[in-house]
Amino acid sequence: MWIILALLTLAGSRVAHGAGKNVNGVEFNLFCHIANMLNAEKIEDDKTDGLDRQAAEAWTAIDSIFTVTANESYYSEGPASAANTTDENQDAKPERVAKWVQKRNQIDKIAAPGNEKNGKYARRPRDRMSAATGAKLDTVFTLASEARVRLMQIDTEIATNKQEIRQQLGLHCSEGQGKGQSRNQHPDNAAFASDYSTACKGSTGPGKSLANDLVCICSTDTSQAQSTLQMCTSIDDANSLFSTLHKRSQCQGDFPCPHRVCAKTAETSELTETNINNCVTAFTATLGRHTKSSATNEGAYVFGSGQNSGDECNGGAATGQSCVSYHDLITAKSGTTLSGAITRLKQLQIAKAKLKARRLLLQNRERQQTRLMALADKMQELYQEALHDEVQLRKEAQNKPQETPDSDKQKACEKYHNKSKECKENGCQWSGTEETIGKCEAKPKAGTEAATTGPGERDAGATANTTGSSNSFVIKTSPLLFAFLLF
């Protein structure tokens, strides 16, 4: 749409026009497209396809696994309150713990895939897994908690950003509007308080809002003729007529007229950075397209068809002098850009910057959601590892070789029964109630395999299986970096 409009605008730019029907048609169509786009507020959707649900499910899985694999204190009473638990009000603690138990009980109701009768997660306390596995569970849960907090912050920032965008759109459309509420746009009372010229030329009225400028190109100071609106559109509709703009009430009553026409004739585009750029480009190309030999700067800073004089936008005739002049705004200071001089364009640029910020927020939101899902996969692996730890530790304990004494040494030591001193001096093991009453035996001979550490004592640098099968991929547990998750 914008490309076609720009081509039509460029094709008709810098040509001499006389008064007549639709003489401001290009300008009107451009304003209609802008007005429709801003009024519709078709801002990019906050939600991304399926990611919200998947991220929420990922957090539920992470939180559930961490709970059933936590130490007894966390499992029984939940995480510490915001305040230091040592200073926690003892009257408040029972209520907090009760809520935690209620929440924890929901985990038991999560059914195993394909078997609704069995719970998905079983309790696996820390003393039944290796210390390395417990440390990895802690790390993943910390990373996931940080991602979840950042997601909540981003959601708040996105909501605030949307209100700020709506505010700028409202200010562009109508002076004094733009608080994020549904807008009833009207031209500016102050600009039209005296007469047409105060709003449509000079340095105070032009460019304050789209409503002001739209009235300027489609109405006159004195005429009530149907041809007044026909300067902008060929639609003949008694409800679309303008009356004289001497009075504020008439000015405000007239403004909805072109909006009804815009709704019939112009498309409604999505509000994007690209479309804002396109509408500014189209406006720049359209500015000054009606050349007038006697007009100020030959009408270079006039929007619409004005009179061929130095007072081109006086609105004094039904079909000849309806335009808005930005001359005083643009030339007031050397080097002033259009966006710097024309207030409504400045507001569009602010809205565009906020749309860019919104796009970056949405991208960050998607990254955090993807991160949560990756962490959920890792947490599931660690849950399987915790189950494997218990089986492996039990198996190692069962297979540990029994220590047996050397038979020759045993015979030699038996000579020192009831002789504590001699027993010890000959490297034997004494067990007795008195120095002269007791047994002397050979010390046990250790097995050929190294002793196995107990639960929670495994070397933090050992290799841990992540899935519980003998041929599965293994990772080093110390140091635990998870570098691929720290983005």
From Swiss-Prot:
Residues 1-19 form the signal peptide. GO terms for cellular component: plasma membrane; side of membrane. It is found in: Cell membrane. A lipid is attached at S470 (GPI-anchor amidated serine). It comes from Trypanosoma brucei rhodesiense. Residues 471-487 form a propeptide. Residues 443-468 are annotated as: Disordered. This is Variant surface glycoprotein WRATAT B. It comes from the Eukaryota. Keywords: Cell membrane, Glycoprotein, GPI-anchor, Lipoprotein, Membrane, Signal, Trypanosomiasis. Pfam families: VSG_B. The keyword Glycoprotein applies. The lineage of its organism: Eukaryota, Discoba, Euglenozoa, Kinetoplastea, Metakinetoplastina.
